[in-house]
């Protein structure tokens, strides 16, 4: 059988796999017409008079802030779970650590520290040892000729935890440590010459897992936020829960802003028609946020679960909303989202850990979620389909290259997506039930963020 025939067969199997278990994305009208179940109808009464849920002061204990509101977190140290997952039961002996970075990742095996923030350096960039985040920050600042202002006394601390706090002081430290502006310009000129000699389809060829890993390292939390999620006068959230729910909406808006910048920089995505870009982001932002939450939450699966005999028999108790910030299960139960909380951890986080999913596979799946040719209203569905098929092939090749002995791994990874879609639809029911989504403005917010050439997103390694 020829290589072409093999490729066609693999593509067909992927399509069948997704279409069999993955329902279509609902239109905005369908989402607004969602009728809450009996469970949701009783939700307001249950929250007004809690009887069995733990007594938690939500305004104080709703969020567990570990190391600063915007402080970054390194990728979780993944551990293989060799025990059979029986519900939430996980009483196996902790397995050996799993390597965070694939062999070809820029941070694999680094022995130097970033001269600017002290994080692990990925090499010498523009004259000094630096991490991917500071490298990207300096490059974007020079290329876009950005100017910053310091809100303090121009002597802010720039380290791994606080490098997002002040762009002015971070840029000044880059210069003081020896980063050269001219090196960025020379790099751009070399890239332009390579582009002129490239094949016309180079934009699709550039879509690779390696490129996605670079983008993941450059995306940081937003200094500002969109207003897609909000608690307004028309919201059906009881008064005692409005403050914590508003905090959750604020977190979601910051993550959506960062997501838009990430999507815009994916090779060839920015060349799609702007209306198609908006539809793709609008159709996937909720799934992408939940997927990122599940990925970050792997690190906390065993926290606060031990009984007296030190056996992990209770469900996972913590979910990581964003780097440095967790939500406790008790608070989720009181807010009426306990089912979604448990499903994210049981159907996504635990399965990710069991599969020993690494960051390369994570970013590939994120791109596959975004590049959904079945989104209604696309003008260039074929272009999106080509990009998604490219990501299928990249992920399949990566699985065979890095996990050659694990047959069926590619399919096992894709089978997490139907569960993600199901959880996403359930969470949408809650968002629309309490009028937390500014539906009429979602498209305009996304359009403004996509068209903004100087996004309010600092570039920093996650």
Curated annotation (Swiss-Prot):
Keyword list, A-Z: DNA-binding, Metal-binding, Nucleus, Receptor, Transcription, Transcription regulation, Zinc, Zinc-finger
Q: Where does the protein end up?
A: Nucleus
Q: Which residues form the NR LBD domain?
A: 204-453
Q: Which residues bind DNA?
A: 114-179
Q: Where would I find the NR C4-type zinc fingers in this protein?
A: 114-134, 150-174
Tissues where this protein is expressed:
Abundant expression seen in males and ovaries.
Q: Which Gene3D superfamilies match?
A: Erythroid Transcription Factor GATA-1, subunit A, Retinoid X Receptor
Q: Which SMART domains match?
A: HOLI (SM00430), ZnF_C4 (SM00399)
Q: Repeat as a keyword?
A: no
Q: Which domain of life is it from?
A: Eukaryota
Q: Name one GO cellular component term.
A: nucleus
Annotated stretches, region: Modulating: 1-113
**GO MF term (any one):** nuclear steroid receptor activity
Which PROSITE patterns has this protein been placed in?
NR_LBD (PS51843), NUCLEAR_REC_DBD_1 (PS00031), NUCLEAR_REC_DBD_2 (PS51030)
Which region ranges are annotated with the description Hinge?
180-201
Q: How does it associate, per the subunit comment?
A: Heterodimer of USP and ECR.
> Can you quote the domain comment?
Composed of three domains: a modulating N-terminal domain, a DNA-binding domain and a C-terminal ligand-binding domain.
Q: Which family does it belong to?
A: Belongs to the nuclear hormone receptor family. NR2 subfamily.
The name of this protein is Protein ultraspiracle homolog
Origin organism of this chain? Bombyx mori (Silk moth)
């Amino acid at each position: 059988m020829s290589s072409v025939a093999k490729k066609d067969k693999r593509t067909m199997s992927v399509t069948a796999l997704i279409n069999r278990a993955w329902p279509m994305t609902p239109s905005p009208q369908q989402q607004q017409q969602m009728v809450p179940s009996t469970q949701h109808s009783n939700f307001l009464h249950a929250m007004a008079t809690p009887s069995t849920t733990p007594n938690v002061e939500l305004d104080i204990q709703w969020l567990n802030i570990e190391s600063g509101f915007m402080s970054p977190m390194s990728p979780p140290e993944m551990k293989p779970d060799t025990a059979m997952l029986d519900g939430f039961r996980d009483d196996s002996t902790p397995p050996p650590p799993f390597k965070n970075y694939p062999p070809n990742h820029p941070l694999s095996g680094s022995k130097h520290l970033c001269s600017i923030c002290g994080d692990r350096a990925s090499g010498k960039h523009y004259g000094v040892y630096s991490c991917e985040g500071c490298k990207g920050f300096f490059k974007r600042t020079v290329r876009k000729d950005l100017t910053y202002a310091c809100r303090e006394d121009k002597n802010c601390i720039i380290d791994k935890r606080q490098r997002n706090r002040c762009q002015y002081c971070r840029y000044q430290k880059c210069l003081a440590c020896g980063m050269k502006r001219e090196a960025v310009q020379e790099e751009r000129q070399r890239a332009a010459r390579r582009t002129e000699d490239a094949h016309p389809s180079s934009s699709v060829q550039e879509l690779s897992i390696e490129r996605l890993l670079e983008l993941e390292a450059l995306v940081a939390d937003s200094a500002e936020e969109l207003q897609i999620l909000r608690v307004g006068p028309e919201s059906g959230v009881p008064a005692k829960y409005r403050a914590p729910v508003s905090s959750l909406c604020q977190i979601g808006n910051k993550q959506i802003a960062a997501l838009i910048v990430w999507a815009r920089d994916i090779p060839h995505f920015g060349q799609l028609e702007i209306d198609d870009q908006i539809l793709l982001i609008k159709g996937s932002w909720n799934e992408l946020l939940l997927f990122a939450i599940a990925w970050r939450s792997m690190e906390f699966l065993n926290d606060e679960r031990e009984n007296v005999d030190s056996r992990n028999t209770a469900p996972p108790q913590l979910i990581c909303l964003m780097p440095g910030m967790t939500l406790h299960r008790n608070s989720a139960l009181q807010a009426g989202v306990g089912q979604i909380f448990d499903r994210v951890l049981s159907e996504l986080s635990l399965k990710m850990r069991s599969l020993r999913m690494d960051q390369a596979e994570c970013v590939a799946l994120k791109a596959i979620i975004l590049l959904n040719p079945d989104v209604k209203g696309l003008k260039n569905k074929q272009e999106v389909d080509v990009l998604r098929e490219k990501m299928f092939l990249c992920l399949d090749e990566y699985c065979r290259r890095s996990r050659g002995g694990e047959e069926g791994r590619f399919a096992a990874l894709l089978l997490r997506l139907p569960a993600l879609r199901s959880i996403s639809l359930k969470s949408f029911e809650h968002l629309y039930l309490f009028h937390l989504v500014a539906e009429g403005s979602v498209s305009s917010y996304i359009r403004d963020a996509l068209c903004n050439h100087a996004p309010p997103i600092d570039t920093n390694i996650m």
